[in-house]
């Protein structure tokens, strides 16, 4: 009560942000008459004027009112649209590096032009991030008219572009692109070997459209570039055949946390089947069967937790994941740790190889690279705490241009799903009777097709929009507001196209008049469409506007709000209602058994619903609990990813320094001296007597790393010799050998060799380190049983592993340079031979790839001492890369087999 009183007197936090901005809106409005009088050329000249003022020391904020007035006038002349005052407010909030929450239909796409133009004046580049290629292309063409009119360059990044096209797009003042493409370009850039090959410029300012979808829903899924490992497809198929034999008593399932485990009885059953199939000796949990346990667990998850047409669909011999928030197909995204391969085995499609990570980053860490970040969406307030804590972004609610006149009805709760769907069909029939359009939101393909079948039986014409048919999605959504139209859609999040009452003129013009080339005929037909849409719009308004029906509550209130927000745009009438049953996932998982008994006691008959505001409140509390749990999961994942992120920044910074350096000989010499110092310290401990020195081991180390056979044992017998003297002698011999090798070639060739090798070995070491980090992460949670904090344990061990990687890197670089034999007849030949080989068949995915032993060898394009490896001649095996399979045929890595010696 006191809170409400205080808000009435002092205003909300939101009001306090917007109040000082209103005087800037007045300033923009005051400039409008003068700017209307400017010619096109005079308006365009404003860009050069603003840039000159910035160079002379004027702050961006001081240019805001004039820049916004310029964009408003340019939009009127190019698009025929004028920014409303509330849109100016939204643009100012975005310029400040905050999130603008603007309701659906309030023109977010147009709002972005204001801060984009202002920040693009610095010529450092502005990125506008969208959720799919269609929206990136559409917005770059549509809003690009405004920027180009004002003399700015506009680029777009979409899938399938080559590096040159990407460089040109990123060099533009304004660049549109999807979150996936921008993130992958960052990773690919940090796998390049020359600065001029990199496509992105230093980060400056980004505006993220549908910011909640990208920074919250997709935050858990890392972007990964990976390379293939060995083929385990037969084992997946063999284990998969055992799963249908399991009965309910063989496993326990927890749907809240999406986990399934074998019971003792199930373990015995599986062991028996594995022995019969001759896949196992001993018991399932013997140390030698670790890989088998992994395959059994993933097959169990694939069969008992994942449902076809709900979690994934099968299309073109592939298992494609369906995004639980948007209902879209996630092409190229794969489940981690062998789960995707287990699903492929379950569905009988081609099993793709597991992969090893070459580079990865989460969206959380990618977008935190921008010095200035802003976002816009229709629904962010429910996640305001997360935006503030993780991204340091404040959410500001922008008032609507016209008051919302949508009626949000209380939820109707039925006992069974059958009754619920029958009630939805009845409501659709009623709406069609008065020609009111209906949009039904479902949570899965399966449910959308079930409802579609029910409507077909009633002979009710309708459109279905789900992951299967997403090619036509923009047109289907645009036409969802026609009189009597019925549209069924899996989660409406991120669809990006307005539902306009009566129909969408732009979309109909594009689809229906594509073949009409005669200008006069085209104008005539467009006028006809306009008149038809206006008549339809009036009919729909009279029938009550768009009726949005939710077929169940999502676990996130935000997704429900997004569905509701499709109705009642720009002051249009509309209505919304959610239909629920006790068989819905949210109700079933969060304690519906008690509720079922209660409803029976109340005498609820078949087909009757219970409707009460208290039920809405109870459901909202259940959703808040799920949201809080999901936030904790994301926050915890970020803490773990931050450990790798700090290391990634160090490695990527070092790579960039190496690429920009012409000469790395100083680093090479420092590496060599540090390696010798560490060798001597290991074999000749401080303050140890001469008879305690391990000179034999030191001799072996020097021979292995430097290919130098030195009389170290003889030196050790000399009277009064100290460890420093031995160290100096080894250093002297190693330096002389390196100098002799440099003298054989031109200085430029040797510099090229050193730089190329250093970059390639750094990449190989980083790749192996990522694999070790992943293995560490998978088992670290078990430390909690020993009363240790898994996060602190992970931080400590990851830091030690990183330090060890850097030590190993010095030794590997030193050793390769000492052993390598260079055979070049010309500098051109040297350049070709030193051109690093790109990893073959890399894959870009939106999930952690599965890991298994094995991997590709170091990508050296240099002739080493024994380059030809003969499997029948152990004398040639020394040339085998450390991570390649051992030539003996054991299946182990070379470094763990014959290379260990």
UniProtKB/Swiss-Prot annotation:
Positions with a binding annotation for Zn(2+): 886, 888, 897-898
Presence of keyword Translocase: yes
Cofactor note: May bind 1 zinc ion per subunit.
Cofactor: Zn(2+)
Binding site for ATP: 87, 105-109, 498
Enzyme Commission no: 7.4.2.8
A matching Pfam family: SecA_PP_bind
Bilayer topology term: Peripheral membrane protein
Listed GO CC annotations: cell envelope Sec protein transport complex; cytosol; plasma membrane
Catalytic activity: ATP + H2O + cellular proteinSide 1 = ADP + phosphate + cellular proteinSide 2
Domain of life, source organism: Bacteria
Subunit structure, interactors included: Monomer and homodimer. Part of the essential Sec protein translocation apparatus which comprises SecA, SecYEG and auxiliary proteins SecDF-YajC and YidC.
UniProt family annotation: Belongs to the SecA family.
NCBIfam families: PRK12904.1, secA
Identification of the protein by name: Protein translocase subunit SecA
Organism of origin: Paramagnetospirillum magneticum (strain ATCC 700264 / AMB-1)
């Amino acid at each position: 009560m006191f809170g409400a009183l205080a808000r009435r007197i002092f205003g909300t936090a939101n009001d306090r942000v917007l109040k000082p901005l209103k005087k800037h809106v007045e300033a923009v409005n005051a400039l409008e008459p003068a700017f209307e009088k400017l010619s096109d050329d005079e308006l365009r000249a404003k860009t050069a004027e603003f840039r000159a003022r910035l160079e002379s020391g004027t702050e961006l904020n001081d240019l805001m009112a004039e820049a916004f007035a310029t964009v408003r006038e340019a939009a009127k002349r190019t698009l025929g649209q004028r920014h409303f005052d509330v849109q100016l407010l939204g643009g100012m909030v975005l310029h400040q590096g905050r999130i603008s929450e603007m309701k659906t239909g309030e023109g977010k796409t147009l709002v972005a032009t204001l801060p984009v133009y202002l920040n693009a004046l610095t010529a450092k580049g502005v990125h506008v991030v969208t959720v799919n290629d269609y929206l990136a292309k559409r917005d770059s063409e549509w809003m690009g008219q405004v920027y180009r009119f004002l003399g700015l360059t506009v680029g777009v990044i979409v899938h399938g572009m080559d590096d040159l096209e990407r460089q040109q797009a990123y060099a533009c003042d304004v660049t549109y692109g999807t979150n996936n493409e921008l993130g992958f370009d960052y990773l690919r850039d940090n796998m390049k070997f020359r600065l001029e090959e990199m496509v992105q410029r230093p980060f400056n300012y980004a505006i993220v459209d549908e910011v909640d979808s990208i920074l919250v829903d997709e935050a858990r899924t890392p972007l990964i570039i990976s390379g293939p490992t060995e083929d385990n497809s037969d084992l997946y198929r063999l284990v998969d055949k055992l799963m249908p034999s399991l009965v309910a008593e063989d496993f326990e399932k927890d749907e809240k946390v999406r986990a399934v485990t074998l019971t003792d009885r199930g373990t015995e059953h599986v062991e028996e089947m594995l022995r019969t199939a001759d896949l196992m000796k001993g018991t399932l949990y013997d140390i030698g069967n670790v890989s088998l346990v992994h395959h059994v667990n993933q097959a169990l998850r694939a069969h008992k937790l994942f449902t076809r047409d709900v979690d994934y669909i099968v299309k073109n011999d592939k298992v494609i994941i369906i995004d639980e928030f948007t209902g879209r197909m996630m092409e190229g995204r794969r489940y981690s740790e062998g789960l995707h391969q287990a699903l492929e085995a379950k569905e009988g499609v081609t099993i793709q190889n597991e992969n090893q990570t070459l580079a990865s980053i989460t969206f959380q860490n990618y977008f935190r690279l921008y010095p200035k970040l802003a976002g816009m969406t229709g629904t962010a307030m429910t996640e305001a705490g997360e935006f503030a804590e993780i991204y340091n972004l404040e959410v500001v609610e922008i008032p609507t241009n016209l008051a919302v006149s949508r009626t949000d009805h209380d939820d109707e709760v039925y006992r069974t799903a059958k009754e619920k769907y029958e009630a939805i069909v009845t409501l659709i029939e009623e709406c069609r009777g008065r020609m009111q359009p209906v949009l039904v939101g479902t949570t899965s393909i399966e449910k959308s097709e079930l409802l579609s079948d029910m409507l077909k039986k009633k002979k009710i014409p309708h459109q279905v929009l789900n992951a299967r048919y997403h090619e036509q999605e923009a047109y289907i959504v645009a036409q969802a507001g026609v009189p009597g139209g019925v549209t069924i859609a899996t989660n409406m999040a991120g669809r990006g196209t307005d539902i306009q009452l009566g129909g969408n003129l732009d979309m109909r013009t594009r689809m229906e008049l594509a073949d009409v080339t005669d200008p006069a005929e085209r104008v005539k037909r467009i006028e006809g469409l306009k008149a038809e849409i206006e008549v339809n719009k009036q009919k729909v308004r009279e029938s009550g506007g768009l009726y949005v029906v939710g077929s169940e509550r999502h676990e996130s209130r935000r997704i429900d709000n997004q569905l509701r927000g499709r109705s009642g745009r720009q002051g249009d009438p509309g209505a919304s209602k959610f239909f629920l049953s006790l068989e819905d996932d949210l109700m079933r998982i969060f304690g519906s058994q008690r509720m079922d008994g209660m409803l029976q006691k109340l005498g609820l008959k078949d087909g009757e619903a219970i409707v009460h505001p208290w039920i809405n409140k109870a459901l909202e509390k259940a959703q808040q609990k799920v949201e809080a749990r999901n936030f904790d999961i994301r926050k915890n994942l970020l803490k773990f990813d931050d450990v790798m992120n700090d290391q990634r920044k160090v490695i990527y910074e070092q790579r960039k320094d190496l690429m920009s350096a012409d000469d790395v000989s100083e680093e090479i010499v420092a590496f060599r001296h540090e390696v010798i110092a560490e060798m001597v310290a290991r074999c000749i401990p401080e303050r140890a007597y001469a008879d305690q020195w391990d000179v034999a081991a030191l001799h072996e180390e020097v021979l292995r790393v430097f290919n130098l056979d030195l009389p170290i044992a003889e030196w050790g017998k000399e009277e009064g010799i100290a460890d420093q003297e031995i160290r100096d002698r080894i250093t002297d011999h190693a330096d002389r050998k390196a100098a002799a090798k440099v003298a054989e070639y031109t200085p430029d060739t040797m510099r090229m060799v050193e730089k190329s090798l250093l970059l390639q070995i750094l990449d190989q070491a980083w790749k192996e380190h990522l694999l070790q980090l992943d293995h560490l992460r998978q088992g670290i949670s078990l430390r909690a049983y020993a009363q240790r904090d898994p996060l602190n344990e992970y931080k400590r061990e990851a830091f030690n592993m990183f330090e060890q990687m850097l030590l190993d890197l010095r030794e590997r670089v030193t050793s390769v340079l000492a052993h390598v034999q260079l055979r070049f007849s010309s500098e051109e030949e040297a350049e070709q031979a030193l051109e690093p080989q790109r990893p073959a068949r890399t894959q870009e995915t939106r999930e952690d790839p599965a890991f298994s032993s094995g991997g590709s060898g170091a990508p050296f394009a240099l002739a080493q001492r024994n380059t030809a490896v003969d499997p029948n001649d152990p004398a040639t095996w020394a040339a085998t890369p450390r991570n390649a399979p051992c030539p003996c045929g054991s299946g182990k890595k070379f470094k763990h087999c014959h290379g260990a010696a």
